[in-house]
Structures are given as C-alpha cells and as structure tokens.
C-alpha cells in the first residue's frame, strides 16, 4: 500500500528513506511499525536517537565514536601505542574488535578519496594521520581501507604521505572480496586479513 505523499506518516517515510540501505518499501514498513508500536516503545526509539546525537561525538585524536573527548581505544593504556590501524568508518573498528585480531590504536578517516564525488585529502583529514605519525612513537601504520577503487586510491595516497616519515606502512591482506565494505566481513576473514597484511 502506497503512503500518501502528504501528512505525518509520509514525512516519517521520507526521513527513513534518507538512511543508508533503506528504500521506499522498507521505510514504509518501518513507519507503519512505529505507528502500530506502543507509544512508550516509539518514544524510547526517538529518545535513543536523540541521545546518540546529543551524547556522542568524534574522538579528537582518532575520529572514532566517543562519549567524551577521547574514545575508549585512545583511553586504553593497555593498547599497543606503536601501531595505528586506519579505517574508513567507525563501524569498521568495532568489526575488527569483535575479531580480536588487533590491540593497537585506530585512525578513522570518515570516508575515502573520491575525486569524482569531490572528496579530497582534506575531507578525510589525511593530514591529521600524518601529524600523529610525525609526533613519533608510531612504528607501523596498517591501512585497512575497503578494496574498492576509492579505498585503493586512499591507501595509495596515504602510503605516499606516510612512507617518508619512517614508519612501516602495511595493507591488510585480501581475504575480503573486492568491492565489499570491510564492516560487513566476518570476524575470521578480518582476523586473517590483519594477520596476512603486507608492507607497501
């Protein structure tokens, strides 16, 4: 059943369609679910969304998700402070953590280079990563960008920026299918990819 393009329900559908991976039909199903749900359940969902927007930010050091100035990984003194694993999105850090394959620091780019879409080095704040390595103490930077054209371009660009600084620059191994986002890979594949990384 099509939702009338006017009114409150249509407004909710239009907002849900803006979410990644949500098409018109899924948005309509979700909107009707919210409508049929108990008022308290719907309000809990709305409050959870508001709390995320009000209570979370990006870590000032690595740009991962944080409830304060620094994320849980940057605050953990037990993590290997000599290695940085570079990912495109915060969700990838949690996928890697579930795999249990890595105990170092992270750097989240919040995207990948895409000149056709107008996304350049300043948009992914590549200079912040370079500055972290320049501060010293970093022995290895592991690039875990997705095996897409944009991810490869980002890895090549970062390698060219980081190699002259003296830290080892490696790339995770390909156990991850080309064209797939890393965050959707299973834990074993991520574990093998990190263990089989190669120098660049």
Language-model regions: role of each:
Residues 3, 15, 198:
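Post-transcriptional modification and biogenesis factors for structured RNAs
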Residues 3-9, 18, 26, 31-84, ...:
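Cys/His-rich Zn2+-binding cysteine-cluster or related metal-binding knuckle/ribbon modules and their
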Residues 4, 37, 41, 117-121, ...:
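Catalytic cores of large soluble enzymes that bind and process phosphate-bearing ligands
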Residues 10-14, 28-32, 43, 47, ...:
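Solvent-exposed alpha-helical segments within well-ordered globular domains of core cellular machineries
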Residues 11, 103, 130-200:
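Long C-terminal interaction/binding lobes of large macromolecular proteins
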Residues 27, 75-145:
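Extended interfacial segments that mediate partner engagement and assembly in macromolecular machines
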Residues 29-30, 57, 69, 91, ...:
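Residue-level signal for pocket-adjacent positions within structured domains
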